[in-house]
Amino acid sequence: MSSELNVPVDPSTPACCSEPGTKGMDYRDWVRRSYLELVTSNHHSVQALSWRKLYLSRAKLKASSRTSALLSGFAMVAMVEVQLEMQYKYPQMLLIAFSACTTVLVAVHLFALLISTCILPNVEAVSNIHNLNSISESPHERMHPYIELAWGFSTVLGILLFLAEVVLLCWIKFLPVDSILKNDTTTIQKPSGHAGWQAALVSTIIMVPVGLIFVVFTIHFYRSLVRHKTERHNREIEELHKLKVQLDGHDRGMQVV
């Protein structure tokens, strides 16, 4: 009868069980084993979480460096290779906007590239070591704000500036087209409404909804990602709370007995 109820006859007598979870295990040993399994699983889960953060930081740094190098190089080539029509009088604000946008675009991407270049080798050195305890040597936890800053500059602000750069480049490239009438003695500049102006306007009309879609998608993506992380953490907290309530109830039952 005592073995069926799993109540030990003598507390000093060890539990006679060859496998965990058998009927011979007394209640106190079961609680102790559950606690040890919980501590061990929490230790491994913390290490797994740290390694997951390490790999995520490494992936973000790699993506930031590649994107920033590509877009900043394109902006520099666009600035150098653009050919201005000397006979056409460009709007002053258009030239100022193009120069400012190109400069800010290159500066933002080079800053993101600088952060990625400085942090990525240290993260790569730790991630290539096949040792679970080497995670503490990685600087990704301390440098997390800088990694997120480089990621945001490269993928959000940098791409928005790149879209604006494309629009301004279309205006500078197409605006002089079919806008100058040359006679033998005079040069007359057409008003707005010619073919080049219409081409630049079409590019702007197309790019504006593209930029809005990009902003909406970015906001939706980050909200979905935050919601996923929140739900996962809530499930883990609920599981820990249920286990705590179960252990507390068993402890109270043991005290009553």
From Swiss-Prot:
Pfam family, one: Orai-1
An MF annotation (GO) of this entry: store-operated calcium channel activity
Subcellular location(s) per record: Membrane
Main subcellular location: membrane
Transmembrane segments: 67-84, 95-115, 149-169, 199-219
One term under GO cellular component: membrane
Superkingdom: Eukaryota
Membrane topology, record value: Multi-pass membrane protein
Keyword terms, alphabetized: Membrane, Transmembrane, Transmembrane helix
GO biological process: store-operated calcium entry
Its job: Ca(2+) release-activated Ca(2+)-like (CRAC-like) channel subunit which mediates Ca(2+) influx and increase in Ca(2+)-selective current by synergy with the Ca(2+) sensor, STIM1.
Family: Belongs to the Orai family.
Protein's recorded name: Protein orai-2
Species per Swiss-Prot/TrEMBL record: Gallus gallus (Chicken)
